[in-house]
Amino acid sequence: MLENRVKTKQIFIGGVAIGGDAPISTQSMTFSKTADIESTKNQIDRFKLAGADLVRVAVSNEKDALALKELKKVSPLPLIADIHFHYKFALIAAQSVDAIRINPGNIGSKDKIKAVVDACKEKNIPIRIGVNAGSLEKQFDQKYGPTPKGMVESALYNAKLLEDLDFTDFKISLKASDVVRTIEAYRMLRPLVIYPFHLGVTEAGNLFSSSIKSAMALGGLLMEGIGDTMRVSITGELENEIKVARAILRHSGRLKEGINWISCPTCGRIEANLVDMASKVEKRLSHIKTPLDISVMGCVVNALGEAKHADMAIAFGNRSGLIIKEGKVIHKLAEKDLFETFVIEVENLAKEREKSLKD
């Protein structure tokens, strides 16, 4: 059952609202050297085209920190500076970026955290308390180990530090590399704080591994009403992180956008190369943002039943096929004419739906 979202304190990263009633935002992270402004800008442009709302960049040295001023001028997305170990880089970064991410496990003493908070206060930018199971502070790691309890205790401790410094513009993440610890940690912390949550599974692996882990962990939490912004971490192509994240949002009921694809797993009845055709159709219609249920079936046996619930369906037969709109057959065509006609019909339906929404 899809539960109502937990209402959290709202913060802003650039012009993007996080928490409260704001849509759940997606973000990713560049892998270029941040000081290489041209390469980093190119990667950010790719994220923007893929539909990202925010982007995070690594600040590994002073050169990276100083480059943020110029990068901010050309970035099409709000910038988050990712800081580990060296708090002074955060002080430089805060002068240019839209948010700072710190890892409480390695940022240093209370005095160093205070310095970062003061810099963020001055520029009116938020902080992410980014807790990682693999790098907890010594006191929590020794007492609890890399467990959900240890992660939650670290988050609560650092949230209290920021609150004591009269700073409440922050969000929290609790990341582990597996599904169970991730879900348990967020569930445990949710009733204890009002702050927005950044969801993610850290070091989740390649496209296949990460998609499974992220769909289970993030999708489950989203359906429970938990989560305000998210990143799907993938070892692979940049755009895939945003593509998978937005798919998780759609299928967890948190984003009403784009096509919900329905296609059969194939069997001995199919009369066409359904695998290639389904891939071809999905690629050709990937630009559509209108919420539609589209069915691609290898035979009429399944198609007629599935099409009753689909906005548009295509069913392949013996060198011919059907196009079905809202449960009614509108075309019976030779196979060579099916694909282009189907694409046109889906595009026209999307336009009809968009027009009706505006009217």
From Swiss-Prot:
Catalytic activity: (2E)-4-hydroxy-3-methylbut-2-enyl diphosphate + oxidized [flavodoxin] + H2O + 2 H(+) = 2-C-methyl-D-erythritol 2,4-cyclic diphosphate + reduced [flavodoxin]
Keywords, comma-separated and alphabetical: 4Fe-4S, Iron, Iron-sulfur, Isoprene biosynthesis, Metal-binding, Oxidoreductase
InterPro entries linked: Dihydropteroate_synth-like_sf, Enolase-like_C_sf, IspG_bac, IspG_bac-typ, NO2/SO3_Rdtase_4Fe4S_sf
Enzyme Commission no: 1.17.7.3
The keyword Kinase appears for this protein: no
GO biological process terms, semicolon-separated: isopentenyl diphosphate biosynthetic process, methylerythritol 4-phosphate pathway; terpenoid biosynthetic process
Pfam families according to UniProt: GcpE
Keyword presence, 4Fe-4S: yes
Needed co-factor(s): [4Fe-4S] cluster
GO MF term list: 4 iron, 4 sulfur cluster binding; 4-hydroxy-3-methylbut-2-en-1-yl diphosphate synthase activity (ferredoxin); 4-hydroxy-3-methylbut-2-enyl-diphosphate synthase activity (flavodoxin); iron ion binding
Positions bound to [4Fe-4S] cluster: 264, 267, 299, 306
Pathway annotation: Isoprenoid biosynthesis; isopentenyl diphosphate biosynthesis via DXP pathway; isopentenyl diphosphate from 1-deoxy-D-xylulose 5-phosphate: step 5/6
Note on cofactor: Binds 1 [4Fe-4S] cluster.
Main function: Converts 2C-methyl-D-erythritol 2,4-cyclodiphosphate (ME-2,4cPP) into 1-hydroxy-2-methyl-2-(E)-butenyl 4-diphosphate.
HAMAP family: IspG
Family: Belongs to the IspG family.
Protein name according to UniProt: 4-hydroxy-3-methylbut-2-en-1-yl diphosphate synthase (flavodoxin)
Organism, scientific name: Helicobacter pylori (strain J99 / ATCC 700824) (Campylobacter pylori J99)
Lineage: Bacteria, Pseudomonadati, Campylobacterota, Epsilonproteobacteria, Campylobacterales
